[in-house]
């Protein structure tokens, strides 16, 4: 083909140059009808094949290649390397374009038809384009089916040209073929003549010749058979393959649209069924997803195989494939990508979570056994043996140390967490206790304030009532004293003065005692003392006025006593005054009792508040004493045991006797010590009992004192009433006796009456004072009897004096 029996072939380059110049001005090669072009090329080839067969020498093959030249290898390129036109034609023009140099359709000469070849019928692999094989005898003949048809042979050497590997993106040196990579197979420089038999070909060559999508496609031009197709040049075959691929894409799009329409119908039906049914139902799964996944994998494989195969224009294919995608397809691909990404993310996250959970569970499970192994003596004994130490590895020890450190860290964290929880609980309890204590203190303060307010109000009310009663008594006394005789007034006023003086003394004592107890009580006592002093001053003033008024009326006494009407008036006024006095005394006694009861209640509360603190102190002191006693007893016992042991160690009989004596002495000492201890304990118990008895006595004395005060007041009131009654009886008897002795002269009667009245008035207060000093204060009956005896004695003395005169 190339040398034509040693002569260079000059028509092909010239025609090729003309065709290249014309092809540059043509339209896009994708718009060419490759089927018609292939048929025209086959027709021209058949027409020109007959002439070439006639002109061809016998020793040459139809392609113009000699057997010797094919076998010689690299030595058959001398003419081509020396020709300058050849290098000028191949290097600049073929390197400029990515499209192969297609021969012009109106070319006058075409390569001759091949010679006799043994063509094997197509095998089962119907899609492969290399199913035909040469005979073993013609193995070294140039193969028309490979991609080097229409170009220089593989062993032709050309100057170095930069190449680019589309698979890896790295520049490397030219192969031995020396031609541009888009038109020759990329790959490392191999042997000069690769094996052309199918069995000896590499697997990449077989994969390269197959179509990327193995789908049954209908071939429109039925005139072109598989055998004729193999005879076509590579650039025509590539054009045909492009056409077939476009047709396949169209068919796939139609099929996808049909499937989508079917899916939409099925989904509508499923939604209608779900709405009509009771519960929600899952959509029926179609085969569309799986088919799409398979198609994606096939497209990926096709893309990978397309990189290996020789493609004249890979960039325009991608550019043309992008606009061919519809919006629905793009959306569907985006959905698939999002599904893939979401599933991958979900799987990654779940894997991480499962790993961490399993790690935590494993760590918790291995905590306790790891500690037990570390602390066990059996493991230490095993590790101490020399033979067993070599079985362990460094990795296992590191892992154990890591586990131990992790377990220790977790233990520390747990302990800290527990400590924090306990501290928080303790702080909460303290706060609650403080709040409760504050509330109790506030309540106590409020109670004390209420009690003080009530006491003050009660005291004010009592003072007002006392002032009213005293005013009434003063008015009644003034009225009664005006009506009484001077003897009666003097006799009645003296016991009143004495009674008031005693009450003053008792009040002063009670005021002094209460002032020492509390400030509030001192205030109440001071107010009561001031009120009593004011009442006493008013009563004393009234008595003075009554005494002054009664002194000039002594002369008229005899005349008044004689009339019976005057006696009746006196008895009425006395009874009325007695009633008023009794009521006033009762009111005063009640008021005093109330005051004392309030004071006693306050003092009892204070003692109760103090008593638990005292009991606590006593219990603490008792516990300390008991501890000291126990410690001393334990020491004495230890000493005895030590002495006994020492005595047992000595083996001599003399020593035994001495030890027995010493033991007896020690026993006596211990007995004496025990006796002393018992005595001390008894004394302490007695002291405690005495203290308790003292407390009880104090309480009883306090109760008795309160009762005695009440009894004293009652007795004093009764004494006053008895004295007033006895004086009135004496006066009545004296008047009756004077009336019976009227037989004597008037002068003597007047003198005797005046003297006796003066003496009786003067003697009666003195005798009453002496008798008061002699009277006991405890029994009520004694006071009544003494008052009666004193009245009898006074009457007897008065009788004796009157008789003597």
Swiss-Prot record:
Source species: Homo sapiens (Human)
Expressing tissues: Expressed in heart, skeletal muscle, thymus, spleen, kidney, liver, placenta and leukocytes.
Claim: Heme is one of the keywords in the record: no
Ranges of Basic and acidic residues composition bias in the record: 197-210, 238-258, 421-463, 470-486, 494-506, 659-721, 732-753
Biased composition (Basic residues): 551-579, 587-598, 607-639, 771-781, 789-805
Designated name of the protein: Arginine/serine-rich protein PNISR
Subunit annotation: Interacts with PNN.
Subcellular localization, as worded in the UniProt entry: Nucleus speckle
